[in-house]
Amino acid sequence: MAPSLKKIVLWSFLALPSPVNISIWWNIGSLLGLLLAMQIMTGIFLSLHYTPMMVSTFSSMVHIMRDVPGGWLVRASHANGASMFFMLMYAHIGRGVYYQSYILQPRTWLVGGNDFLLSMATAFLGYVLPWGQMSYWGATVITNLLSAVPYLGDSLVTWVWGCFSVNQATLNRFYSFHFLLPFVILVFVLVHLLLLHDKGSSNPLGNMSHVSKVSFHPYFTWKILWVFVLLCFLLYVLLCYITLMYLRTPKTFIEANPMVTPTHIQPEWYFLFAYAILRAIPSKIGGVVALAMSVLYLYTFPLALYSSAAATAYNFIGQLLFWGYVSLFFLLTWLGACPVEEPYISLALPLTVMFFVVPGLYMISSSYIIRSFQFLLSLK
């Protein structure tokens, strides 16, 4: 290993100066990296036995679960690991919003947004691969949303499908991209890490103080390893042994039948908030735009660069707005799993409007509090 590369690795993982007062919320990024590595490894093992053929895909999944030694554990680890990955990713994003990392490190925030989008795309592609009833119809419904694009919509849908319906060509494309995208995510994660360590990590005070810092190793490496051990215990003992497929939709275990449409089509739980927003808008193109903005709005947070950073812990209004926003996320997730009927339809629209309004109010409130403090200090 070249000396320069060795120095970069040691600086990034061992000798990095880290604030002494960071809490467990700052460990989530490292846990996400470990989970990403685990997902890549389990995915490679699954790909050794998976058959991307419409006539035998579902049978190959049954073969993995029944005949391959430890195959059931590998598949359960991969499926439940994806759920845990998104749990931690949402917590990681929430920590960044709460402590306003988008102001302190805007470039790192934007690259992290790319990681989030690529992770969502990878998870959606993987959801289709078992070729169950919900997988097939989920792919049909979600990809058909591209038809809302003016002029190019129908051509885009045909291009994604590879034909005039979801078929063998679609499965081949989804399998190829699901295998490749995690490595693209890995590249963006490394860029995210380099940008983060370029300026140093923030702290619960909401600043970039360089006064009190310690070496990342051994003070924080052991802490991360202990949390990762607890995470593995939760994943394998509770999710893989006790509740093997509790987070999966039951219709996923029924082989795909293009002639029978499920009464209720829904994605995985970590996409339900966006799915509820999609269904809340009566217009198809309006729903697609709202669906896209429910994720892309994260890129607007660095627009608050005109203000200084201040932790939400010192902003009571910001705390109310932040936890209100978290409540909206959970409510929309619940509504996304509910059938399309009253009163769920009437509840979804106002919650969707609030979902887009509250983040803007949060950023405005933070800027207002900061300017108020600056004004009071100027009076002294």
Swiss-Prot record:
One of its GO terms (biological process) is mitochondrial electron transport, ubiquinol to cytochrome c. InterPro entries: Cyt_b/b6_C, Cyt_b/b6_C_sf, Cyt_b/b6_N, Cytb/b6-like_sf, Cytochrome_b_N_euk/bac, Di-haem_cyt_TM. Its cofactor is heme b. Its main location: mitochondrion. Binds 2 heme b groups non-covalently. It is a multi-pass membrane protein. This is Cytochrome b. It comes from Cepaea nemoralis. The gene is MT-CYB.
